[in-house]
Amino acid sequence: MEIKELIAKATANMEKAVEYLDEQLSHVRAGKASPKLLDGIMVMYYGNATPLTQVASINTPDAKTIVVTPWERSLIKDIEKAIMDSPLGITPENNGELIRLGLPPLTEERRRQLVKQIKGDAEDAKVSVRNARRDAIDAIKKSVKTDGTPEDVAKDAEAEMQKVHDRYIKKIDELFAEKEKEIMTV
């Protein structure tokens, strides 16, 4: 494999790690109501587990409330049960037509738990980025031995790989810091 391809492949893997972290962080409740909080909830719909977003509309009328309006009234009990069974820890209010979810303010202890959780997620993303760099550098060194790639070209490629690595690690740190600030803001 050519060196440019190795760097491109490693960069793509690093980008995937950052995108995955961003997705993970979007599901962490930071005190503000967000429809994304309900993304992972599955509702039994005609015997099949179906994502809540496919059987109801989800709105946030204010920063502390999520409103779930089922497209079929008969689903309201199933939606309520799915939300209660989820790890969100939110008790739904069912008025027969829609479900309101009032988000209680986060306690200091819960905020610290969330920060600890996202710190672990960020560390996992960093490990993925480092692994992509290591694999690319190993492949570059191998190409020097087997394909006859010049040493100076290999050194330049390793330096380039390090720059890409540093850029993605910085991105991960920025995502973490932003989410941490969001969680810790009362």
UniProtKB/Swiss-Prot annotation:
It comes from the Bacteria. One of its GO terms (cellular component) is cytoplasm. InterPro entries: Ribosome_recyc_fac, Ribosome_recyc_fac_dom, RRF_sf. One of its GO terms (molecular function) is ribosomal large subunit binding. Keywords: Cytoplasm, Protein biosynthesis. It is found in: Cytoplasm. This is Ribosome-recycling factor. The lineage of its organism: Bacteria, Pseudomonadati, Bacteroidota, Bacteroidia, Bacteroidales. The gene is frr.
